[in-house]
């Protein structure tokens, strides 16, 4: 099968490597490279199957500038919420392509370990279960794939866990110990589920690979960019310097503002996200911790 991966960052490169095991693959590049597997955006749009691994905040602009109403089937591997429109990825892509040609990839998966061909399990969500199964068949045997109808739940989990990973990184950056991190992540899972309930996401999604699985991975490892952002914030650095030092995109930073705006709009109780936003804006990490410890909790 011919598949083009759009986005040549770490995640896009890892997906290209995995999908190349069983398929004829190419990957887009924004720079001139003398490598046969790199193709231009125009060439990529000629492929029947596309896998998007772009930074979430850049996807709408990419679609406006490049997308033509062809018959591609698309797997979205980007995790985030568009900050300008406060739309989830299915809504962003839905402006350009029908939902029966869209699937979404989620689950615990560090790009570096996928490149090392270490085993992992992922979820492919979509309204068209035949297409989900088709995309699932493209992956090699060291990546176990499941399918799901709960697009919104998978999207919320994939976006929200990045913000919770920032909070977890702060916790570890302050050397508060394993008990504190476990408490924070557990409360974060409850908060993420509460947010998802408003959007009619399915409860089982939050307890599976897309939810608890991805959250526990991202919130407990220095391989996570968002976790490293939190750890740096705990040391007293401002977010501008943290991101310069990181040198990579940390989706959780922009996603925190998007979730915060949505929670205010719909009056959803999200204390951890609220404190992450305040820390991004300069609030002392210790003060945020104290406020979280004294905040009310609707569900334990």
UniProtKB/Swiss-Prot annotation:
Intracellular or extracellular location(s): Cytoplasm
Q: Which PROSITE patterns does the record match to this protein?
A: NAD_G3PDH
**What is one GO biological process annotated to this record?**
glycerol-3-phosphate catabolic process
- From which domain of life does this come? Bacteria
In terms of Pfam families, this protein maps to: NAD_Gly3P_dh_C (PF07479), NAD_Gly3P_dh_N (PF01210)
Cysteine pairs bridged by disulfides in the record: none
The active site is formed by 161
Task: Tell me if Nucleotide-binding is a UniProt keyword of this record.
Answer: yes
- Gene coding for it: gpsA
Q: In which pathway does it act?
A: Membrane lipid metabolism; glycerophospholipid metabolism
The molecule here is called Glycerol-3-phosphate dehydrogenase [NAD(P)+]
For molecular function, the Gene Ontology terms on record are:
glycerol-3-phosphate dehydrogenase [NAD(P)+] activity; NAD binding
Gene3D superfamilies, per database record: N-(1-d-carboxylethyl)-l-norvaline Dehydrogenase, domain 2, NAD(P)-binding Rossmann-like Domain
Q: Name one GO cellular component term.
A: cytosol
Alphabetized UniProt keyword annotations:
Cytoplasm, Lipid biosynthesis, Lipid metabolism, NAD, NADP, Nucleotide-binding, Oxidoreductase, Phospholipid biosynthesis, Phospholipid metabolism
What biological function has been recorded for the protein in this entry?
Answer: Catalyzes the reduction of the glycolytic intermediate dihydroxyacetone phosphate (DHAP) to sn-glycerol 3-phosphate (G3P), the key precursor for phospholipid synthesis.
Does the record's keyword annotation contain Transferase? no
What organism is recorded for this protein? Campylobacter lari (strain RM2100 / D67 / ATCC BAA-1060)
Q: Which InterPro entries match?
A: 6-PGluconate_DH-like_C_sf, 6PGD_dom2, G3P_DH_NAD-dep, G3P_DH_NAD-dep_C, G3P_DH_NAD-dep_N, NAD(P)-bd_dom_sf
Give the catalytic activity. sn-glycerol 3-phosphate + NAD(+) = dihydroxyacetone phosphate + NADH + H(+); sn-glycerol 3-phosphate + NADP(+) = dihydroxyacetone phosphate + NADPH + H(+)
Which residues bind NADPH per the record? 11, 33, 79, 111, 225, 249, 251
- Residues at which sn-glycerol 3-phosphate binds: 79, 107, 109, 161, 214, 224-226
The family annotation for this protein states: Belongs to the NAD-dependent glycerol-3-phosphate dehydrogenase family.
E.C. number: 1.1.1.94
């Amino acid at each position: 099968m011919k598949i083009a991966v759009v986005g040549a960052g770490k995640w896009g490169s890892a997906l290209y490597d995995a999908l190349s095991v069983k398929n004829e693959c190419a990957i887009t590049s924004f720079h001139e490279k003398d490598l046969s597997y790199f193709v231009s955006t125009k060439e990529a749009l000629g492929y029947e199957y596309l896998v998007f691994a772009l930074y979430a905040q850049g996807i709408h602009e990419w679609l406006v500038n490049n997308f033509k109403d062809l018959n591609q089937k698309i797997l979205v591997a980007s995790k985030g919420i568009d900050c300008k429109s406060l739309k989830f990825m299915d809504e962003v892509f839905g402006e350009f392509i029908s939902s029966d040609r869209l699937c979404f990839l989620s689950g615990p998966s560090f790009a570096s370990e996928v490149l090392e061909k270490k085993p992992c399990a992922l979820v492919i969500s979509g309204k068209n279960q035949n297409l989900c199964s088709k995309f699932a068949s493209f992956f090699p045997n060291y990546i176990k794939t499941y399918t799901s109808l709960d697009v919104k739940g998978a999207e919320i989990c994939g976006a929200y866990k990045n913000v919770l990973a920032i909070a977890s990184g702060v916790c570890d950056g302050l050397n508060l110990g394993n008990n504190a991190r476990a408490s924070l992540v557990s409360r974060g899972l409850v908060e993420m589920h509460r947010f998802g309930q408003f959007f009619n996401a399915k409860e089982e999604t939050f307890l599976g690979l897309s939810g608890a699985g991805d959250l526990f991975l991202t919130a407990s490892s220095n391989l996570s960019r968002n976790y490293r952002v939190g750890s740096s914030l705990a040391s007293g650095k401002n977010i501008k310097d943290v991101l310069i030092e990181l040198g990579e995109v940390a989706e959780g930073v922009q996603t925190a503002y998007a979730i915060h705006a949505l929670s205010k709009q719909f009056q959803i109780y999200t204390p951890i996200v609220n404190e992450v936003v305040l820390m991004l804006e300069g609030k002392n990490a210790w003060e945020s911790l104290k406020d979280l410890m004294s905040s009310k909790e609707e569900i334990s």
